[in-house]
């Protein structure tokens, strides 16, 4: 399609989520080509971003995951090159990649989040276990795909979970466990799509469950009552806007047994694999994967 020009699908990279990005990128590349788009794979771990200009690309479909591709670094470089790209800008990408600062912003805006504590080597781990109650989730602040996450179930295990998470990031958070159910809501442009309920066969929705297991159950529509579904979509859109997101993102949330919603995190470069959730939500609205890729590509911007 001439309207898009020559499109670079940025995929791979050198983060711990490289494998997932390559799977997502392969799907996007195939979909765009099937629609007549002059699309080409581009792995920034193999050549510099300056090659985008040198090779005559007109815009970028960013499907990199994790640090560099999703944390504002890439976005700043593309801005400097004057290269239009999909997804959030520099500020929103940087904030959303940082779970701690995301929580601070959402809390400041009055949006519901689980209780949490920032951990360091001097933390009173026993006191935090008592304060948050068990179980507790411990997470690196800037990793995605549940990498480095531990569910602490027994007293005295919090420090070890902190040490594990610190292998991936210097900033580590401990988060209150919310039972009841995990959900996600895709946002594209100004529209929040049908929520999805995630029912992992494993103890929680970890890396293997997200990308490789076939026994994770995804329910879309999620089965929420209409008024709760509307509330969830409204919160997802508010969360998206508070972070300054644009283009597309996916907002994850939890719901307790009483039906209260708690925002978890925002993913500004969602997966687009066969297991991924944004394509699933789009299908529920009658949007095929190939058309979804075009919808995302339509949001390219610079500045």
UniProtKB/Swiss-Prot annotation:
Pfam families named in the record: Dala_Dala_lig_C, Dala_Dala_lig_N
Cofactor binding note of this UniProt entry: Binds 2 magnesium or manganese ions per subunit.
E.C. no: 6.3.2.4
Stretches assigned to the ATP-grasp domain: 103-298
Record-annotated membrane-spanning stretches: none
Keywords (A to Z) from UniProt: ATP-binding, Cell shape, Cell wall biogenesis/degradation, Cytoplasm, Ligase, Magnesium, Manganese, Metal-binding, Nucleotide-binding, Peptidoglycan synthesis
Pathway connected to this protein: Cell wall biogenesis; peptidoglycan biosynthesis
PROSITE patterns named in the record: ATP_GRASP, DALA_DALA_LIGASE_1, DALA_DALA_LIGASE_2
Example GO biological process: peptidoglycan biosynthetic process
Molecular function (Gene Ontology), one example: ATP binding
Catalytic activity: 2 D-alanine + ATP = D-alanyl-D-alanine + ADP + phosphate + H(+)
Annotated binding of ATP, by residue: 129-184
Binding site for Mg(2+) 2: 265, 267
Manganese among keywords: yes
A cellular-component GO term for this protein: cytoplasm
Cell location: Cytoplasm
NCBIfam families registered for this protein in UniProt: D_ala_D_alaTIGR (TIGR01205), PRK01372.1 (NF002378)
Family of this protein: Belongs to the D-alanine--D-alanine ligase family.
Function field: Cell wall formation.
Protein name according to UniProt: D-alanine--D-alanine ligase B
Species name: Chromobacterium violaceum (strain ATCC 12472 / DSM 30191 / JCM 1249 / CCUG 213 / NBRC 12614 / NCIMB 9131 / NCTC 9757 / MK)
Origin organism lineage: Bacteria, Pseudomonadati, Pseudomonadota, Betaproteobacteria, Neisseriales
């Amino acid at each position: 399609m001439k309207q898009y020009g020559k499109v670079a699908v940025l995929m791979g990279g050198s983060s711990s989520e490289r494998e997932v990005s390559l799977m997502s990128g392969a799907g996007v590349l195939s979909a765009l080509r099937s629609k007549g788009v002059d699309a080409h794979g581009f792995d920034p771990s193999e050549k510099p971003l300056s090659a985008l200009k040198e090779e005559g690309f007109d815009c970028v479909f960013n499907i990199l995951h994790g640090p560099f591709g999703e944390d504002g670094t890439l976005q700043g470089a593309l801005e400097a090159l004057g290269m239009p790209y999909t997804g959030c800008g520099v500020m929103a990408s940087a904030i959303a990649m940082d779970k701690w600062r995301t929580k601070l912003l959402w809390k400041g805006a009055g949006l519901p989040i689980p209780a949490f504590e920032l951990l360091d080597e001097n933390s009173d781990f026993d006191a935090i276990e008592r304060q948050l109650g068990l179980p507790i989730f411990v997470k690196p602040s800037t990793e995605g795909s549940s990498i480095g996450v531990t569910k602490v179930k027994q007293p005295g295990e919090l420090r070890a979970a902190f040490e594990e998470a610190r292998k991936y990031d210097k900033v580590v958070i401990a988060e209150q466990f919310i039972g009841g159910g995990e959900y996600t809501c895709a946002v594209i442009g100004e529209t929040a799509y049908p929520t999805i309920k995630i029912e992992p066969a494993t103890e929680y929705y970890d890396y293997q469950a997200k990308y490789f297991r076939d026994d994770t159950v995804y329910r879309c529509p999620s089965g929420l009552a209409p008024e709760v579904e509307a509330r969830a979509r409204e919160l997802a859109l508010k969360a998206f806007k508070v972070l300054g997101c644009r283009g597309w993102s996916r907002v994850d949330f939890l719901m307790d047994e009483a039906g209260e919603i708690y925002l978890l995190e925002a993913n500004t470069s969602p997966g687009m694999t066969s297991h991924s959730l944004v394509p699933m939500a789009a299908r529920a609205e009658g949007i095929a994967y190939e058309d979804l890729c075009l919808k995302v590509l339509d949001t390219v911007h610079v500045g």
